[in-house]
Amino acid sequence: WIGTVLAFYFGKANFEAATQSYKDAIKTLTPEEKISRLAVKDVMLPVKDIVYLDLAEESDKPIPAILEYERFKPYNRFAVLDKNMVVKYMIHRGVFYQFLYNSFQSKETSTENQPKNVTLKDLLESNDEQFKKMLNRSVGFISISANLLDAKRVMDATEECFDVFVTQTGKNSEPILGLLTNNRIFQYAKV
């Protein structure tokens, strides 16, 4: 019976040592090692929780009205999706304000060009190269089977990218399944 007690005691000590070793190892993981262990599907904002603009329904809405939408008050980025839930644009609040300002400053200011009448469609169809560039950047795409480090790498490789959308295979022509923002990745990368 003494052997049984000693085996139990040392077995418990070994278990506690192993547990402590595991805890110490977790603490020493780098942020990249930590996020490489997290599946995108487990940490993304699911599509049902994404606040977005419906391209077909809202393209004729005045930009000032869009900026006043209650659902967007906490956000500085506006995802624009088509009827198939495919991302068309990610527009930063500042782009809207800059476009309104430019419309107001335009020498062709008329009743239609007054900022209160400028629509989302006007922005999307603008011939101004500055706005074309702003509308066609800053979004990445990744497969649902990827990990968070993969998402960070996509973000790092894309100029001024703050958002990575999750699709089935990572193609931008597919319906989105979720979203990872730079803030969300940073949150999970904290050690």
Model-assigned labels for residue ranges:
Residues 29, 106, 182-184:
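HAD-like aspartate-dependent phosphatase fold
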Residues 53-75, 80-82, 100, 122-128, ...:
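The conserved cystathionine-beta-synthase
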Residues 8-45:
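Membrane-proximal helical linkers
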Residues 1-6:
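Canonical hydrophobic alpha-helical transmembrane segment
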Residues 31-123:
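Membrane-proximal soluble helical/coiled-coil segments
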Residues 86-90, 172-179:
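Glycine-rich acetyl-CoA-binding "A-motif" of GNAT/NAT acetyltransferases
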